[in-house]
A protein has these predicted regions:
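ATP-dependent phospho-/nucleotidyl transfer catalytic cores
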Residues: 1-32, 89, 139-145
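A structural signal for short hydrophobic/aromatic patches embedded in well-ordered alpha helices
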Residues: 6-9, 94, 111-112
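A generic short alpha-helical patch detector that favors 3-5-residue windows
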Residues: 8, 57-60, 86
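Active-site acidic catalytic loop and adjacent metal/ATP-binding pocket
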Residues: 15-63
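Aromatic-glycine-rich donor-binding/catalytic loop that engages nucleotide-sugar donors
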Residues: 50, 102-103
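Active-site activation/catalytic loop segments of kinase-like enzymes and analogous catalytic loops
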Residues: 62-102, 118-134
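All-alpha amphipathic helical-bundle segments outside canonical DNA-binding/catalytic cores
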Residues: 104-116
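ATP/Mg2+ or Mg2+-diphosphate-binding catalytic cores
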Residues: 122-161
Length: 161
């Protein structure tokens, strides 16, 4: 059963990666990579400053925007437990505002929900390393738990645009 579920998720990921193929080779730009309320400050003259550049580097702007949108919708401290509906609304507002300044291409708009879902699936519960460890340890219960998380997060039909 786990193998069938894993294969389904792998096919979903492969489809998203295929759609991202042309986007991956776009120009890369310097990005902060981790803009949050704890990494920004307001100067006395009203400018916004950034610090904490541990995630800074070069990235395709679209990829950075999707990751930043996910971060804003899931990892920021809003002082309350976020529901899926609240997270989706935050993501919608982030992407609405972002696209007012830098519109997405049709290609980017088409792949964004799937890419967002994929990030969500692997970010919840630190699946990247948790799954690797569970497979190495042949921990069927942990693998099943992580596949459950991934299946809940994978639906690309969430209203984030």
């Amino acid at each position: 059963k786990e193998k069938e579920r894993a294969v389904k998720l792998i096919h979903f990921a492969d489809d998203i990666y295929a759609k991202l193929a042309t986007i991956r080779f776009r120009p890369r730009y310097a990005v902060q990579g981790d803009i949050s309320d704890c990494n920004t400050y307001l100067t006395p003259d009203g400018n916004i400053g950034f610090f904490d550049y541990n995630c800074a580097g070069e990235n395709v702007l679209f990829a950075d925007a999707v990751m930043q949108g996910w971060f804003e919708a899931h990892l920021m401290d809003y002082g309350t437990e976020l529901t899926d509906e609240m997270s989706d609304r935050i993501a919608r507002e982030f992407f609405r505002g972002y696209r007012e300044v830098r519109p997405f291409t049709d290609e980017e708009t088409a792949v964004l929900p799937g890419m967002y879902a994929l990030i969500s699936a692997f970010a919840k519960g630190n699946n990247r390393y948790a799954m690797t460890n569970a497979v190495k340890e042949q921990d069927a219960a942990k693998i099943d738990e992580l596949l459950d998380i991934m299946e809940r997060e994978i639906p690309a039909g969430r209203k984030i645009l």
